[in-house]
Curated annotation (Swiss-Prot):
Forms a stable energy-coupling factor (ECF) transporter complex composed of 2 membrane-embedded substrate-binding proteins (S component), 2 ATP-binding proteins (A component) and 2 transmembrane proteins (T component). GO terms for cellular component: ATP-binding cassette (ABC) transporter complex. ATP binds at residues 40-47. Its EC number is 7.-.-.-. It comes from the Bacteria. ATP-binding (A) component of a common energy-coupling factor (ECF) ABC-transporter complex. Unlike classic ABC transporters this ECF transporter provides the energy necessary to transport a number of different substrates. Residues 5-240 form the ABC transporter domain. Transmembrane segments: none annotated. It comes from Streptococcus pyogenes serotype M1. This is Energy-coupling factor transporter ATP-binding protein EcfA1. PROSITE patterns: ABC_TRANSPORTER_1, ABC_TRANSPORTER_2, CBIO. Keywords: ATP-binding, Cell membrane, Membrane, Nucleotide-binding, Translocase, Transport.
């Protein structure tokens, strides 16, 4: 599968007198239809990277290719039309008096016909389960509902790429999981490419690959399973240790023959059943 995003030796500084570059020769690619999670401590360069991809910042050196086109000043708006951004605080994105108005805002700015706007708005709200709230004021919604509306606004623009910048971090665990599942369903149905900056294990577990950033560089890329198998190293990367990994570690320390590495809850359940049956 071809790459829809590619960064080649990208370097960026916010200030000329910085001791270390904010990004230092960053190179990676994202495949069409892939879900890539980007993790790392604060200051590792995660948010800077996605702002460069969206053309909100300009690299000092290196190149960024989006959907086959080199990102430049002349085509930055064309590139942005291919990308939907959802941020940590949805209140910063709302501009409409009602949910329906807000989702329609970007479409109206593109000069899309009224009937097409109505159809796209209704479809996007249906995808995120918010069609019954379209006459509501965004300020009166819960945190999870606000993020669903923000996602609907992005999806209505029919982007090829959706970027989530800590989009689930302000939600409670239930709301976070529901939102992640909604994003997964939309991604699967429409073959969208998803880039997610996150510290949430459930979000990371659903991704195809995980890119770890450290001190403005790419520390590693791996599958979620390979990442979770790193055990205590996860704490140094800004993640918790998955519950199943902690259980596996405890069993191994007690001498039980459990497979090393990350297991899903179902896989761990199967292993425990096998152990019990042999006792």
């Amino acid at each position: 599968m071809s790459a829809i995003i590619e960064l080649k030796k990208v370097t960026f500084n916010y200030h000329k007198d910085q001791e270390k570059p904010t990004l230092d020769g960053v190179s990676f690619h994202v495949k069409q239809g892939e879900w890539l999670s980007i993790i790392g401590h604060n200051g590792s360069g995660k948010s800077t990277t996605i702002r460069l991809i969206d053309g909100l910042l300009e690299p000092e050196s290196g190149s960024i290719i989006v959907d086959g086109d080199l990102l430049t000043i002349t085509n930055v708006w064309e590139i942005r039309h291919k990308i939907g951004m959802v941020f940590q605080n949805p209140d910063n994105q709302f501009v409409g008096a009602t949910v329906e108005d807000d989702v329609a805002f970007g479409l109206e700015n593109k000069g899309i016909a009224h009937e097409d706007i109505k159809e796209r708005v209704n479809h996007a709200l249906e995808l995120v389960g918010m069609q019954n709230f379209k006459e509501k004021e965004p300020a009166r919604l819960s945190g999870g509902q606000k993020q669903r509306v923000a996602i609907a606004g992005a999806v209505a623009m029919k982007p090829k790429i959706i970027i989530l910048d800590e989009a689930t971090s302000m939600l409670d665990p239930k709301g976070r999981l529901e939102l992640i599942k909604t994003i997964k369903n939309i991604r699967d149905d429409y073959q969208l490419t998803v880039i997610s900056i996150t510290h949430d294990l459930d979000e990371v577990a659903l991704s195809d690959r995980v890119l770890v950033m450290k001190d403005g560089q790419v520390e590693s890329t791996s599958t979620p399973e390979q990442l979770f198998a790193r055990g205590d190293e996860l704490l140094q990367l800004g993640l918790d240790i998955p519950f199943t990994t902690s259980v596996v570690q405890m069993l191994q320390e007690e001498g039980y023959p459990v497979d090393y590495g990350y297991l899903t809850e179902k896989e761990l359940e199967n292993q425990l059943c096998q152990l019990i049956s042999k006792m």
